[in-house]
Amino acid sequence: MCAGFYVAVHPWLETQSLHKVGHTGNLAARLHDGSYTTCFTDEWRYCFTLETPTKKDAQKIEAGVLYCAQFFRVKNKELLCLLPEKIKQLAEDVANCLNISYTLCDAPTYEMNDSTIVVEPSSPSDPLISKEKLRHLVITPVEDEDRFADDVLFFSTGETRTTIEDRLYQREAANMGYQELQRSGRAILQMACRCGKTRVAYLILSNYLQGKVLYLVPGLSLLRQTLEKLYLYGISLKNVMLVGSDQTRIVLNHDTIEMTTNPVIIVKRIQEASSLLVIATYQSSTLLVDDFDLIISDECHRICGEWETRPFTHVLLNFKKGHRLFLTATPRYDTPLSMKNRELFGGVAFRYYLREGIEAGYVNDFELQMVAAPKLAHQLSNREETTKQIIVKQIIMALAYLKTNVRSPKMLVFTRDIKQAKELYAELVDLGVYALIAHSTLPRQVILKTFTEFCSSKEPVILLNCRLFQEGVEVPELNAVFFAAPRHSPRDIIQSICRPLNKQVQKPHATIFLPLEVNTENVCLDKFSSIIPFADALASEDPRFYEHLLNPSEVAYPINWIGAHGSVAELLQLARHAIRYGTQGKIDRLTRSERLPWKAAFAELKRTVEICCRYPKINDGFHFGGATLRFDTWYKWVIKSYLQYKNNEPSSLEPYQVLDLESLQDWTTRGVGGPYPWEESMAFLETWLAQNKGELVAIDIHQGGWIGLDATPMERLSGVLTTVSQRDGRSYGKNRKLRPKKGFMIPPQQAKDLDRIFGKHNLKWRKDRDNGFLKEDEHGNYTGEPTCIQEAYQTFKEYVKTNPEYIEKYWPGYAKGKHKHQELPHIWESGLAPPRYKAFKDGNKRLIQRSPKKKDVKN
């Protein structure tokens, strides 16, 4: 007799996607027991069994499975509303967690004879098991919806199989990813959906094929498609092993290959091979051993979640060898185990925005349509019923809009949960709308049939689902998505938006529908709160949308309103205001430095360095999206974040951004240190005084030194001493405004440097004071003895007239006026310098273009 845990199915139960779980001391006799044959026909069969050494071990597995699948259990029955594959994976995880040895048998048959029939003694239904050990294996409804999509309907969202020629950005991504792997051992490639991450992964893993490579994917369908693409790119199946639970043979041209979950075969081949490519699902990763030179984690945001060992985190948390490459379109940062963890994930080595893919022609464009609530629907008494009816009417309005632009539109509707999907489906069908529904509690065959019907329909059709089709599913003819419930996760939002964006010849732009409860002219900003997370997520992927929010009059964006009862223009303005300033309407959320689109801001920084031959000044402005921004604020944030990154501290910058900065001329010296580096200037001052018998000679402290990258040491010293002279007499510290004209507004260490250097030559550099305050007349003019810095400036003014050779040597180009404007003359004349940022007393902020015709004067 053979004891074991089993999952059995009967045709009557299978129609409802129900499966019987249990344990027995005699697998050969169990399905012939009276409890099975009395109420059912004799059509029982095993889906699979886990043969165990003892019946008690099998009982523990059953108890563990029922505990972990409690949300999918029929009350007081050993029936689970889960796919057999899910129960199998769960049972194996439970057995491994409880250290129970087992033999997995798929669809087994056992010989039955008279001696097999044994009456089994009853046993406690709930044996002692450590639920704390199994807590991380508990399946929640949301998690199961995700995993179901992984294994059943995970379709490719990358390039088509005929696209083999590398795109420019793919080569760039591969180069930057490989460089970061060599530098730190970890790299993230964040690339928009449908932009060919698999091709980039192939270009990188080609450098590791002499060793062992592991390619992890979140589902069996994606495993097969990844294999097909890599085979198309030139990978030989000779050195490929597939680790997954699908026993179907895969045929590629004349080559064939099969998956395996046999741990003996897997471990032996990995350990004995000198070169090997293993493609495995995350769910099967516990069968692998830590012996890889490169590990690629596709759709790596799925790894994130609770900080605990589970199939998706097994390799990340337990494997120590090899480089790690992570691929995703939507990083996840809102979980305990998140991609902010640089030690585990590294940083983003390459970033490719959704808008870039659209403009390059690889991704279909889209429009936003906000759908207003029906005018009188809010007057009903039942709030829950009202919301349901509002959404139904908004869905019908959206479908009607699509019919005017598309011949046979197809629209995905994402609901809050399965309950809402069922309710909306019933309402729509009653109203005669052609609607379909799919969710994880339906049998697999029903879901596939529904999906096929949706894809092949020649009539306008709606498909309601919760999360089943949110990620990875490709419907070539899909025209629109409708959010029937607010989404707060940027990952969920972007993945859902990308569903209809696959590029096809003559396919019209897609439509994203956002329903809002705005039904009167007295609109409250709180009504727009549901779209703020959506707008934040989209703005991070689409710089054009970000620019539009800053100034819609200058940057157009395809956004409109359906069913508005008031002025559409006013409603859109209110929506933009709520997105930018929040529902309280107070703080500008968009102009924070970290939210400024990197590529646009860095392009302006690079232009300033390369064309103007300098780094930004305090009063430089930036014109972006029609908004007036102070560029120096962003620039200071960049420097701070860069220093944090280099000091291995938490930083807002990613590796690709650091590489951008370090590609600029003199970034680590002039970019970070500024045009007037203190230590460098003090060293020059000390040498100068020693060589010139303690005489400062001539220094310009009126305009300060030239700030260009080609500035001479004397020009940089002029800038430093200009600052010293201006700050003498001002307080240092947070309360300096309360102590005017007293103290010194410079760090104490720098004051010590000046005392030491000037003190060697008995030079006075501080201004005179009376009881701690500067000596001044009633008009504020300094009346004390001049300092050596002031005396050097008087000499400088004389030299400008009498000693042009000296001026040209230490201040080259001074006579041409570059000192006055701190710009190269030809840059000034052509108007290529950054505009000046100025905030006026009336609250307005303007950019004043620097040019000879418009002098830089107060307005």
UniProtKB/Swiss-Prot annotation:
SMART domains: DEXDc. Keywords: ATP-binding, Helicase, Hydrolase, Nucleotide-binding. The keyword Nucleotide-binding applies. One of its GO terms (molecular function) is helicase activity. Its EC number is 3.6.4.-. InterPro entries: Helicase/UvrB_N, Helicase_ATP-bd, Helicase_C-like, Helicase_Restrict-Modif_Enz, P-loop_NTPase, Phage_T5_Orf172_DNA-bd. Residues 178-349 form the Helicase ATP-binding domain. Residues 394-553 form the Helicase C-terminal domain. PROSITE patterns: HELICASE_ATP_BIND_1, HELICASE_CTER. Pfam families: Helicase_C (PF00271), ResIII (PF04851), T5orf172 (PF10544). ATP binds at residues 191-198. A motif (DEAH box) lies at residues 298-301. Belongs to the asfivirus helicase A859L family. This is Probable helicase A859L. It comes from African swine fever virus (isolate Pig/Kenya/KEN-50/1950). The lineage of its organism: Viruses, Varidnaviria, Bamfordvirae, Nucleocytoviricota, Pokkesviricetes.
